[in-house]
């Protein structure tokens, strides 16, 4: 029988519940348990796919094509289990499901209410998500409840968790509450009152936390922990100090040293073997003792909110770990390049243009790509970054003046990137789309395996085929591929069914690669990722070459 750990948050949002949940999962996995994680989001959107990055941050795409919360990216980076659509659901999905049942008559004419119908549906979704992992043999499912205790939106989820723990009985559910202990500089002290009130609010609805994770910008002294313990009715050894660190990969060791996993295992009636966190210790050691460093320029339009590129930033960190180098990421606003030019790129060891949507800032990205191509700077283009690399090459090398994407200019004289109106989904069904189709359901999403052209850089990186995740509506237009290849571009991977370009490269350049997929979603600190490791090695070589020429 699967046991559950519910992770809640108090005082303020963005405290790092996802990191805390993933870190606990990593410790339990190191103790030999089969663990999965779920994220419950209280917003009414069906999924975050059409939400602004400024509102929600990154949209993480799972292997089965679900557009999910960025916390699922943390989950995959911390444990070995792969996340799926069932690992993340929202209030919108719950209500959508309940309303469908009501229309079908499943409730036999009863008045449909939040309790019991909505809360029962939440419990069914949670159980289904837990059973989907490990062929139904999940030992522990850690369930992160989004939002903050006291929010109206979170109440049905908290009530469902309370009911679930009651129904399952003793030693089958535990609660971990993450809260803020702010430091007031003018008073020179930490304040525990917000945490006390947060726990009181939780207890009012019938939830009594087994563990309190107290987040602060410094270690919380024992006397303050004792005060929190007394007023919150949580044992002192379960009041855990969680202070700011320079790497999220230090959190598992921090929690383990304070006995969090032992408290949770005791609450769940589990006696697994001791934890082995040597892998995490080695990762942290590699992070703290790099042998070299590189500076990567990430050119985008969401640079003021780096959460929009969370998986990508982490993938570069992973590549640094596996090349024993410190990767410094410099976020550059593409609109700034449009006004100030490319001189601000001269100090960079490599340039990267990530995925994105919309016309704003695209000419700045194209200027950065041209700078990388003409100056031999290693370049990696992801999704939109590949499409813009094709546009830049078409304009300035292949002689296709005015080349563009129909996303930005529907009347472009040379639409080298266009909306593909018909394609086959992962199940082999033919789907059609056009400019009037709903944004939430018209993208190519999820993992797809593609053969790689022999003798290419792509083959030296990936081998004979590549299996990566997608999230895009537009594709490189096959009509123009012969003209591009005649000018020196190589299409190094194509989809097996539609023959759509998946990877491009420039053999005449030291390292210039574009990919239509999102490799950042499959990078982990344990294994890194071959594409990003190759890219960072190229950046190190470029840096060394520039130093020789200086």
Curated annotation (Swiss-Prot):
GO terms for cellular component: cytosol. GO terms for biological process: 'de novo' CTP biosynthetic process; pyrimidine nucleobase biosynthetic process. CTP binds at residues 13, 151-153, 191-196, 227. Residues 430-459 are annotated as: Disordered. Its EC number is 6.3.4.2. Residues 295-545 form the Glutamine amidotransferase type-1 domain. It holds the Pfam family GATase. Keywords: ATP-binding, Glutamine amidotransferase, Ligase, Magnesium, Metal-binding, Nucleotide-binding, Pyrimidine biosynthesis. Pathway: Pyrimidine metabolism; CTP biosynthesis via de novo pathway; CTP from UDP: step 2/2. It catalyses: UTP + L-glutamine + ATP + H2O = CTP + L-glutamate + ADP + phosphate + 2 H(+); L-glutamine + H2O = L-glutamate + NH4(+); UTP + NH4(+) + ATP = CTP + ADP + phosphate + 2 H(+). The active site is at 383 (nucleophile), 518, 520. L-glutamine binds at residues 356, 384-387, 407, 473. HAMAP family: PyrG (MF_01227). This is CTP synthase.
């Amino acid at each position: 029988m699967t046991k559950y750990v519910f992770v809640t948050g108090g005082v303020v949002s963005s405290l790092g519940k996802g990191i805390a949940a993933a870190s606990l999962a990593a410790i339990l996995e190191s103790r030999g348990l089969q663990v999965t994680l779920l994220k419950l989001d209280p917003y009414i959107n069906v999924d975050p796919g059409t939400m602004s990055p400024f509102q929600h941050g990154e949209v993480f795409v799972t292997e089965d094509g679900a557009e999910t919360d960025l916390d699922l990216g943390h989950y995959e980076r911390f444990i070995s289990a792969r996340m799926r659509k069932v690992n993340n659901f929202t209030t919108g999905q719950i209500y959508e499901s309940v309303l469908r049942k009501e229309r079908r008559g499943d409730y036999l004419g009863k008045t449909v209410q939040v309790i019991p119908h909505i809360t029962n549906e939440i419990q069914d979704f949670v159980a289904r998500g837990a059973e989907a992992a490990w062929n139904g043999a999940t030992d522990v499912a850690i369930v992160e409840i989004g939002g903050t205790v006291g929010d109206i939106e979170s109440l049905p989820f908290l009530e469902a968790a309370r009911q679930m723990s009651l129904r399952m009985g003793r030693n089958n559910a535990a609660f971990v509450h993450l809260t803020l202990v702010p430091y007031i500089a003018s008073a020179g002290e930490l304040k525990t009152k917000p945490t006390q009130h947060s726990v009181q609010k939780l207890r009012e609805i019938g939830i009594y936390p087994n563990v309190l994770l107290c987040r602060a910008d410094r270690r919380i002294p024992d006397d303050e922990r004792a005060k929190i313990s007394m007023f919150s009715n949580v044992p002192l050894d379960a009041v855990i100090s969680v202070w700011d660190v320079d790497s999220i990969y230090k959190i598992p060791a921090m929690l383990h040293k304070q006995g969090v996993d032992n408290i949770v295992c005791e609450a769940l009636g589990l006696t697994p073997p001791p934890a082995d966190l040597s892998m995490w210790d080695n990762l942290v050691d590699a992070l703290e003792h790099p042998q070299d460093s590189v500076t990567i320029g990430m050119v985008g339009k969401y640079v003021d909110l780096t959460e929009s590129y969370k998986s990508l930033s982490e993938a570069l960190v992973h590549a640094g770990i596996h090349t024993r180098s410190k990767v410094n990421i410099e976020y550059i606003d593409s609109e700034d390049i449009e006004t100030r030019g490319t001189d601000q790129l001269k100090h960079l060891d490599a340039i990267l243009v990530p995925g994105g949507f919309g016309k704003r800032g695209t000419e700045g990205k194209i200027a950065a790509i041209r700078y990388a191509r003409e100056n031999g700077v290693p370049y990696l283009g992801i999704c939109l970054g590949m499409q813009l690399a094709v546009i830049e090459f078409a304009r300035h090398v292949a002689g296709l003046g005015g080349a563009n994407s129909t996303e930005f200019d529907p009347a472009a004289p040379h639409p080298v990137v266009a909306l593909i109106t018909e394609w086959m989904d992962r199940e082999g069904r033919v789907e059609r789309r056009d400019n009037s189709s709903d944004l939430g359901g018209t993208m190519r999403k999820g993992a797809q395996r593609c053969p790689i052209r022999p003798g290419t850089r792509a083959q030296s990186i990936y081998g004979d085929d590549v299996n990566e995740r997608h999230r895009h509506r537009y594709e490189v237009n096959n009509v123009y591929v012969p003209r591009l290849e005649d000018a020196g571009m190589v299409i190094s991977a194509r989809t097996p069914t539609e023959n759509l370009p998946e990877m491009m490269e420039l053999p005449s350049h030291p390292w210039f690669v574009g990919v239509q997929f999102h490799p950042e979603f499959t990078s982990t600190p344990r294994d890194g990722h071959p594409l990003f490791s190759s890219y960072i090695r190229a950046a190190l070589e470029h840096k060394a070459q520039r130093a020789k020429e200086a």
